[in-house]
Amino acid sequence: MKRILGLIAYASVPTVINAVQISVDETAPSNPVFDAYVSYSIEFSSFPDYAGNNSRPNTFSENLLDNLGKITGTKPYIRVGGNTQDYALYNASLPYSLNGTIDPKRSSDYPTTIFIGPSFFESYNSFKNTRFIHGFNLGLGGNRTSGWQTLLDTVPLACKALGGGKLFAWTYGNEPDLFSTSAQGPVRPPSWNEAEYVDQWLNGTRKIHELLERNCPDLAKNGTYGYIAPSFAGVGNKLKAPKAWGEGLNEDKNIKLFATHNYISGATSPGVTLQGTLMNHSMTKASVDAHIVEYNQVKAIDAAAPPLIFGETNSLYNQGRPGLSNTFGAALWGVDFNLYSASVGFKRVHMHMGTNYRYASWQPIATNKATIGTKAPYYGNIAVASFLAPPPSSPYDSPATSLATVKHLPISSTPFLSAYAAYHSSNLTRLILINLQSYNTTASGEGLAPLPPSSLTPRPSVTFNFTLPAAYLLTDGGKEKQVVVKRLMANGSDAITGITWDGWSYNWELDGGRPVRLPNVTRTSESERAWVGEGTSDGGKAGLGVVVEAGSAALVEFV
């Protein structure tokens, strides 16, 4: 086939050092993602920081959520949970939202002794037009009087705070597969097993339903009431999700979504690197595929098992690692991870974050450990949302056209490139190309001290050559079909600042997280347009080539 177009120019076209050929099938997958595919999980103890309260709502967080909502038509769903939901006890006389004590021997990142007061639930008023998942305490609630009393006291408060369409679902317990082995302190004996977990889960969720019927009857109805579960930490721990399902976890048929958690590796795990661990498509694929194997085992037990989501996930467990989880390379990992997950059947992904967490998409407040600001991973979230968003001609209120299906376009020659196609109403609407080859511009690759100009080498690039469906040939009237390219860019994969999406910045210091077009970044309308050309020798297919620099991504949109 004759490739008509070599590519789309970027500000300065680098020397092409490699090229890959990819064929794009016109047949769309049949498994669309849910609305608000890019969603969040906020650490329970950090929720007041992220959301604020009635007197002081966190408008920075609200702006960042609004950005995503304006792109996709639905704001991200917020799951409030994590390890600290299973430490939280209720104190009705507490004059503020949360009192937490950090024990460095257990965790230096979040409190492990926690009391919440009535005003904790004010935080659910801060984000407008947002749906929530609230986490109740099973860790202490299932085996301690104080924990059980907390459940009795907080269900009425939570349900009243989440009325009026705010509630999506509940959770009861976070990562119960680790209850007997947790590094932060076990809350169950070594004999803890799936049958005991299911017994305690059913006991607690039935009490929750009883309390809802008494206090918030509208939230006890079948159309509203439900859970995401089992929220296990992974597939390799002591408790196994298929066995828990077989023990009757969904006996009451109230689990809306099958939720699992995932981290590619650990913050202090030996051998973890940006290139080898995060910017590595093979690692991402293997990590996600293990969950598909597990989910298929659940489906074999129960063919009607609910849809699959990541209820909590991010790059490296234990809140991430500086120089890895907070870099632009982690943003590129997030794009690859989210879209590969979508391509194999995950319906929604909740990216986890907390105050001072290294992998967080943003830091909600200033602390003695971190400054308030938009972090690199958020830009990856924006890119994923832009890829999945309804095409411009499709109204947000039309489910048939607004929900995307995603196809993984395998590249077998290297683990450092990946590509995906998005379809709406069976029509190819976008491609995204991710160059995961690292390109560092700071000393030690930690994103802090820039290398001197004399130490910088030319930034490599790869040309993605596409064979497209015949529908992307010239039209009958001879009008060329135009594409627009939007780029996710930074100075290098180790950068922690200076990141842009299509020339836009979402930084706190510019306009509180609202999008600001940077004048020194080339605009799409000026230099990132191209046309799909006519093929000649392979059945009339069209060709397209796109150059993508190392440590960057490009979205191709058919217009």
UniProtKB/Swiss-Prot annotation:
Superkingdom as given in the UniProt entry? Eukaryota
InterPro entries the UniProt entry points to: GH79_Enzymes, GlcAase_C, Glycoside_hydrolase_SF
Keyword line = Glycoprotein, Hydrolase, Secreted, Signal
Residues of the active site: E194 (proton donor), E312 (nucleophile)
Q: Per its UniProt record, what SUPFAM superfamilies does this chain match?
A: (Trans)glycosidases
Glycan-carrying positions = N53, N91, N99, N143, N203, N222, N280, N427, N440, N465, N491, N520
Its localization reads: Secreted
Q: Which GO terms describe its cellular component?
A: extracellular region
Q: Name one GO molecular function term.
A: beta-glucuronidase activity
Q: Where is the signal peptide?
A: 1-19
Secreted as UniProt keyword: yes
Q: Known EC number(s)?
A: 3.2.1.31
Q: What class of enzyme is it?
A: hydrolase
Catalytic activity reported = a beta-D-glucuronoside + H2O = D-glucuronate + an alcohol
How does acidity or alkalinity (pH) affect activity?
Optimum pH is 6.0.
Q: Characterize activity with respect to temperature.
A: Optimum temperature is 45 degrees Celsius.
Q: Which family does it belong to?
A: Belongs to the glycosyl hydrolase 79 family.
State the function annotated in the UniProt record. Answer: Beta-glucuronidase that hydrolyzes beta-glucuronosyl and 4-O-methyl-beta-glucuronosyl residues of arabinogalactan-protein. Hydrolyzed heparan sulfate only very weakly. Has no activity on xylan from birchwood. Able to catalyze the transglycosylation of glucuronic acid (GlcA) residues from p-nitrophenyl-beta-glucuronic acid (PNP beta-GlcA) to various monosaccharide acceptors such as glucose, galactose and xylose.
Protein name as it appears in the record: Beta-glucuronidase
